[in-house]
């Protein structure tokens, strides 16, 4: 039997979540967005825990195209504890039977959709969230996790080093590009209303920036683009001036955080999900380059404007640390090493 290339990461997830899985023993979960980056890590860690702990649990995954998912993730597709339910998140027919937990992981960030069809972005987020909440009511679910985004805070002020959950910023509604952030804000409000009106125990995970196996390399994620360039032996291209700050949570830690927030988060509570160690975009690019020999050159498209404060997109994770005991256990250097190794092994 071929060893799972994510075995070390999945053991890491299990080590930090072992007591939680008893809540899912013999239960059924329903997951939307299961084919995206968050979703594949949720499913990988679910299947791993299910096998090792003998949970006899089942995850039913909503997808528009089961065949495409099977082609991309054949191991998950064939796993006996994972089933697929075909449909669009905005209008899917409700699967039969009872479900104890629902994870609404659609819709992930898509710069292309947000730019080219912001109305579709808003509709997918808002209609999909209401449809999934209605299903949670109908199927008897007791817990509901929404994966939201740090985009709900709008632009982070440059003098605010880390954004806390009670920061009341917002996207700029005069910009069509705010569709994603505003859609997620409304999705969170739907969750609040359903939680209060129907006594559904809802928790919200506001994601920031991530790195790890299965992160798209050709999307709008800068770190993914840098990895793509370096893996191809090309110069690493930075489209801007390289000064904005980000922080990166590794995918295995992300899975720990999501399961913990679903199963132990306080109902009605929002939790930032990310790392606090800020690094500039140029710093990220140079860290990626340093992982290769010879190191590819790093090209910065624009010169920074003197005296202009650097943009930031960095969360405070104090709430998750103090209430749930969560940490960013795997630092950026090790995260890059594991991500590069996984991508190289895929193409060997």
What is the meaning of each model-derived region?
Residues 108-112, 150-157, 177, 208-214:
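Active-site segment of SDR-like NAD(P)-dependent oxidoreductases
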Residues 32, 62, 102-108, 144-150, ...:
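SDR active-site strand-loop-helix element
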Residues 86-124:
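NAD(P)H-binding glycine-rich loop region in Rossmannoid oxidoreductase-like domains
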Residues 130-177:
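Conserved Rossmann-fold NAD(P)-dependent oxidoreductase catalytic core, especially the SDR/UDP-sugar
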Residues 5, 83, 164, 209, ...:
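C-terminal substrate-binding subdomain of Rossmann-fold SDR/epimerase-dehydratase oxidoreductases
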Residues 179, 183:
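Active-site helix of classical SDR
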Residues 149, 188-213, 224:
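Conserved beta-loop-beta element that borders a ligand/cofactor-binding pocket
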Residues 1-101:
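N-terminal Rossmann/SDR dinucleotide-binding element
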């Amino acid at each position: 039997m071929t060893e799972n290339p994510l075995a070390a990461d999945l053991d890491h997830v299990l080590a930090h979540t072992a007591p939680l899985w008893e809540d899912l023993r013999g239960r059924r979960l329903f997951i939307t967005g299961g084919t995206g980056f968050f979703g594949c890590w949720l499913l990988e860690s679910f299947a791993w825990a299910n096998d090792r702990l003998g949970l006899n649990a089942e995850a039913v995954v909503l997808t528009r195209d089961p065949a495409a998912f099977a082609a991309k993730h054949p191991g998950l597709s064939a796993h006996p504890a994972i089933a697929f339910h075909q449909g669009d998140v905005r209008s899917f027919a409700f699967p039969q039977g009872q479900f104890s937990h629902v994870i609404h992981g659609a819709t992930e960030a898509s710069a292309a959709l947000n730019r080219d069809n912001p109305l579709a972005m808003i509709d997918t987020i808002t209609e999909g969230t209401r449809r999934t909440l209605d299903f949670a009511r109908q199927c008897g679910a007791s817990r509901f996790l929404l994966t939201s985004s740090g985009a709900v805070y709008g632009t982070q002020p440059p003098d605010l080093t880390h954004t806390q959950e009670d920061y009341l910023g917002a996207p700029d509604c005069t910009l069509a590009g705010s569709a994603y952030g505003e859609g997620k804000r409304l999705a969170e409000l739907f969750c609040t209303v359903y939680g209060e009106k129907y006594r559904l125990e809802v928790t919200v995970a506001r994601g920031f920036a991530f790195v790890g196996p299965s992160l798209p390399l050709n999307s709008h994620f800068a770190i993914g683009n840098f990895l793509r360039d370096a893996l191809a032996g090309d110069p690493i291209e930075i489209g801007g001036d390289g000064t904005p700050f980000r922080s990166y949570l590794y995918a295995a830690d992300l899975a720990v955080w999501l399961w913990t927030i679903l199963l132990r988060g306080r109902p009605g509570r929002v939790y930032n999900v990310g790392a606090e160690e800020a690094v500039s975009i140029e710093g990220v690019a140079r860290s990626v380059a340093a992982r290769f020999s010879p190191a590819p050159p790093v090209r910065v498209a624009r010169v920074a404007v003197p005296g202009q404060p650097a943009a930031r997109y960095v969360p405070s994770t104090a709430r998750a640390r103090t209430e749930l005991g969560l940490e960013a256990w795997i630092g950026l250097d090790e995260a890059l090493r594991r991500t590069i190794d996984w991508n190289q092994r895929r193409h060997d």
